[in-house]
Design a protein with these regions (language model features):
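C-terminal membrane-cytosol helix-exit motif in multi-pass small-molecule transporters
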Residues: 310-322, 403-404, 494-498
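Soluble extramembrane regions of membrane proteins in the secretory/endomembrane system
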Residues: 1-294
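Alpha-helical transmembrane segments of integral membrane proteins
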Residues: 350-614
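Contiguous hydrophobic segments
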Residues: 315-336, 567-575, 601-608
Length: 614
């Protein structure tokens, strides 16, 4: 799957430059939109690809290939003797991810193993896309370039190596948060890379994009690896300075950006630098200044559309609740006598937040690569991280809920299940299975409505619901199957989570009508839902912004940094939106089911709709 941007000036009679854009891990072709729009507005044909395992591509991530070893420093700086070249075992997805930076054109010492495994296509489909772009009659084959972000930078290196020495070899490579390697890692005598620009994020959460150093500073700039790349001495090395010659393809530059890993794709400084680089290498028309950038307007409008679509779910719910069948999903709230004192609520809230913070870094990474799951069933890589975390929290919540229920029963409480948001007023002494089923049908109708809206948006505008990164996309059969696999665990987690948060968070505001009552409930619910994650945000970024190191790397080791730390920028806003939906639906229906099932479905949709699949 790809998206092609073609300016009106591109014809067979007047061919124009062509650029292949390759997205990063957990993203898709639409994440490249900022670069694509800016390049196309300046006269280039731009092809944005869904790489293996991402977006709508049917080939899984496993098609990149893998071997049974990994390198724990930059390639070409490793050795068996010092332990930086290691044999690995475990789950296939772990081996695949440990070989992201192992590239197909590296020496066989790296790309094959004794078990017959190999790196088959580290371009992740990029080479096929590049060949397609080069063959277009409105593209000048002498003016081709590549740019990739994160995982896409390894694909970019691979495409450039594959077409080196051909009539269509790329004249420039722009790496958005890329890893470097020594010339000794590959056949440097026969493989060369023309005019390489590295956009370096100062606060990159991934250690391999910082050369496994704690921070990005001048010491990193002057390392042997970096000076070899620039073609200069340590004394000559400087940020934001071009070395070499564009004419012979030796131009090199490292641009330091004051941003983090994920935001590099839309960083104005980086975009302007890249556009100038493309002008110098493939003749991109800069009549429109590099600083004239409109892509964020598109992102803002799509964000508004997504939020409006999600908010309209509440209107659909209200409409459905007026029908005789769904009106029975509305229950009265438990009596005010069961409201917890403020002190007891704060103790529970603090415990909840600390528990989430203590388990998030470990369980997400454990599930990401090491948890022994059937990989032909559980194929979502980041999804497995959340699955692992949710499973642990489910066990904890089940135990504490059972203990709490038994205590209430001994005290003679009459509204046990209703008090937890799980039962009806008519039969508060037992689980409300009928209520659950009715609420599930209600949520199914709401989701069907949202899917139709999304389908219209995709067909009419070639856009899904997102903000830079993929959120809601239409499903193919494989991804819908994954949605069905993960949804039961997500649903159980959110039902228990809302039962532990919404019901105990009842306060005087719960019984107040209108916005004042909603706000008085929401801030408590939001704090408990997102507070633990905010603790992790502070732990990760305070020492990082102080130029010490990412907090996760300092406290837990670099194994627990990277993907799930960089995900926090997406995860926190998602949870805040879920807290609004869950608070509103709990106050409206008197049970946790509608809010929990809605949040679970949306969260599962985000994880399975377009992100990485093995």
């Amino acid at each position: 799957m790809y998206k092609l941007y073609t300016p009106k000036t591109a014809t067979a009679e007047t061919p124009v430059p062509g650029v292949l854009l390759l997205h990063g891990y957990q993203n898709d072709h639409e994440t490249c939109a900022a670069y694509a729009i800016k390049l196309a507005r300046r006269g280039a044909v731009v092809l944005c690809l869904d790489e293996y395992g991402h977006g709508s591509t049917t080939a899984g991530l496993i098609n990149r290939g893998y071997v049974n070893h990994k390198v724990t420093v930059n390639y070409g700086e490793d050795s068996v003797e010092d332990g930086t070249f290691k044999t690995i075992g475990g789950q296939t997805r772990y081996k695949v991810m440990m070989n992201f930076s192992n590239l197909s054109f590296f020496d066989k010492h790296y790309t094959t193993d004794a078990d017959g495994n190999s790196m088959t296509d580290s371009s992740a489909g990029g080479s096929y896309a590049y060949a397609l772009l080069a063959a277009m009659d409105n593209v000048d084959p002498a003016r081709l370039a590549i740019s990739g972000h994160s995982m896409g930078t390894w694909s970019s290196w691979s495409v450039a190596a594959n077409f080196c020495g051909t009539d269509v070899e790329p004249k420039a490579v722009v790496l958005q948060c890329g890893e470097l390697f020594r010339d000794s890692a590959y056949d440097a005598a026969n493989i060369h890379f023309n005019n390489v620009l590295l956009l370096q994020a100062k606060y990159d959460e991934f250690s391999y994009f910082r050369d496994y150093k704690n921070v990005v500073d001048d010491e990193l700039l002057k390392s042997d690896l970096r000076t070899e790349f620039l073609g200069c001495t340590a004394d000559e090395a400087a940020w934001n300075t071009t070395y070499g010659s564009f004419e012979d393809g030796t131009a090199r530059r490292m641009e330091l950006l004051n941003t983090n890993h994920r935001l590099t794709t839309h960083n104005a400084h980086g975009l302007a630098t890249a556009l100038t680089w493309f002008s110098d290498t493939i003749g991109l028309d800069l009549t429109l200044a590099p600083t004239d950038q409109v892509a964020m307007t598109k992102e803002a409008l799509v964000l508004i559309a997504m939020l409006a679509a999600v908010a309209s779910l509440m209107a659909v719910m209200e409409l459905l609740l007026t029908t005789p069948f769904f009106s029975k999903a509305v229950q009265p709230l438990p009596g005010e006598a069961s409201v917890k004192p403020n002190g007891a609520w704060w103790r529970g809230a603090i415990i909840t937040m600390l528990l989430a913070a203590a388990t998030y870094p470990f369980m997400t990474q454990l599930g990401h690569g090491l948890l022994p799951l059937p990989e032909n069933i559980f194929r979502m890589t980041v999804g497995n991280g959340f699955l692992s975390w949710y499973l642990l929290l489910i066990l904890i919540m089940l135990v504490t809920s059972i203990i709490g229920y038994q205590k209430n029963k001994k005290r003679g409480a009459q509204d046990g299940w209703q008090s937890m948001g799980l039962g009806t007023a008519a039969a508060s002494g037992r689980m409300g299975w009928g209520l659950l089923g009715r609420c599930a049908l209600l949520v199914l109708c709401m989701l069907a409505y949202l899917y139709v809206l999304l389908l219209i948006c995709e067909k009419a505008f070639l856009l899904d619901f997102r903000f830079i990164w993929p959120f809601f996309k239409t499903f193919d059969a494989a991804r819908f199957g994954q949605f069905c696999v993960y949804l039961p665990v997500f649903a159980l987690f959110f039902i228990l989570n809302n039962s532990k948060i919404m019901a105990p968070a009842r306060c005087k505001a719960t019984y107040l009508p209108g916005f004042k009552g909603f706000l008085g409930c929401w801030w408590r619910n939001a704090l408990m839902m997102v507070g633990g994650i905010l603790i992790i945000v502070l732990i990760e970024y305070i020492p990082f912004f102080m130029n010490i190191a990412p907090g996760a790397d300092l406290l837990f080791g670099s194994t627990f940094g990277g993907p799930f730390m960089s995900l926090l920028i997406l995860f926190v806003p998602q949870v805040l939106v879920f807290s609004v939906l869950c608070t509103y639906t709990y106050r409206r229906t008197g049970s946790v089911y509608v809010g929990a099932l809605t949040a679970a479905s949306l969260a599962c949709w985000i994880v399975t709709g377009g992100s990485s699949m093995l």
